[in-house]
């Protein structure tokens, strides 16, 4: 197997393990209490999220919500993995990293949705009474992966091709 494919699989695996481990710890230790980490800015608090990242689609009808969320997680994982396996020799290290972050995060949340019917979120950032929706390692991984991929495609790839 190609080095880039192995890197992709390794990073994806680490994200999945990190995500599921932190969610299990959150479920175990935060079930009945929140822990203030940085007063006025950051808490650890268990939130059961039936929606997508940052609570999106939480109010959608259950059947539609489940189909969209499970389907989108499967599609994201399959597309990112397929893209890496098909064009691995042409991918930059940053592209491999960004796609692995997206894939690993998608699989982590897919596990929760499939096995638990909802996702365990626990990272709560806020300023005063204004809270950002709670999220987890998978959500952060997907968001960072998408940002890196878009940034690479818009800014860095052009420079790489012209040099």
From Swiss-Prot:
The active site is at residues 121, 139. It is a multi-pass membrane protein. GO terms for cellular component: plasma membrane. Its EC number is 3.4.23.36. It is an enzyme of class 3 (hydrolase). GO terms for biological process: proteolysis. Belongs to the peptidase A8 family. This is Lipoprotein signal peptidase.
């Amino acid at each position: 197997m190609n080095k880039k494919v192995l890197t992709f699989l390794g990073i994806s695996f680490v994200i999945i393990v990190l995500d599921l481990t932190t969610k299990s710890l959150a479920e175990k230790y935060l079930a009945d209490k929140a822990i203030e980490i940085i007063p006025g800015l950051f808490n650890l608090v268990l939130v059961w999220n039936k929606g997508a990242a940052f609570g999106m689609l939480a109010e959608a009808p259950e059947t539609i919500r489940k189909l969209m969320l499970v389907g989108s997680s499967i599609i994201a994982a399959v597309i990112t993995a397929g893209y890496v396996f098909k064009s691995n020799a042409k991918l930059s290290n940053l592209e491999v990293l960004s796609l692995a972050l997206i894939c690993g995060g998608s699989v982590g949340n897919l596990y929760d949705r499939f096995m638990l019917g909802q996702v365990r979120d626990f990272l709560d950032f806020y300023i005063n009474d204004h809270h950002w929706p709670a999220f987890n390692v998978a959500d952060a991984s997907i968001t960072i992966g998408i940002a890196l991929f878009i940034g690479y495609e818009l800014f860095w790839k052009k420079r790489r091709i012209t040099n």
